[in-house]
Amino acid sequence: NVIVCGIRNISPQLSLEMAQLCVAYKGRGVIAFDLAGAEYDHPAKHHLEAFQLVRDNNICVTIHAGEAYGPESIHQAIHVCGAHRIGHGCRLREDGDLLHYVNDHRITLECCPSSNVQTGAVRDLASHPMKLYYDLGLRVTVNTDNRLITDTTVSKELWLAHTQMKLGPEEIGHIVLNGFKAGFLPFHVRQHFLREVSEEIEAIQSGNLEDHGTKPKARKVAAGDKSSAAKEAPSASDSP
């Protein structure tokens, strides 16, 4: 599945054309619309027409926000552009009221630890806010942002979350499940993946791999582009 991505610092007309492609290929491999690129001096609202088009056609939205700019960028992404998920969200911690709103409405944060260190959004992995967000109950996921430039994988990011950010095995399991809960997929598909992955996580954590093989099965990352994980009980339901 593909998430069509516009860029903040290109013409809003080009973003609209990307959104039109998103609508044209809905149900034929395209599942959502994204906006990435430089936040400073390139607010998401400049691309509002593109967001209105995809939302009018019941297409999900994710927006990179709160990485290189403050919580105002996250606020605009959610309340003006209608984002269902937020890419990065590092600076959400600067606005407690908005943080509570994101938590209460189960808006997923697509955390990208290694990339955030590389871009200077955080000083190092130890100072990354993902653990704080997890402890506060936000629906966080672990992502690569990009695999090539950052030279990483979701598995590597999960390992770093465990070794450098002090998230335990059970917490990592919750975070993995959040990636499937946040997936831009039909409800019944998410339910199917959640049941399978919940059983596999339980088997791995209990050491009972007889019914699951000696190696974990390869899984699709349900969040569509980059997700894997936050503080949710490892249940097969798709509820908060």
Each model region followed by its residue ranges:
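Histidine/acidic residue-rich metal-binding segments in metalloenzymes
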Residues: 1, 13-32, 39-63, 67-82, ...
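Active-site beta-loop-alpha junctions enriched in small/polar residues
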Residues: 3-9, 35-40, 64-68, 89-91, ...
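Short secondary-structure boundary/hinge segments and terminal tails
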Residues: 72, 95-96, 119-120, 151, ...
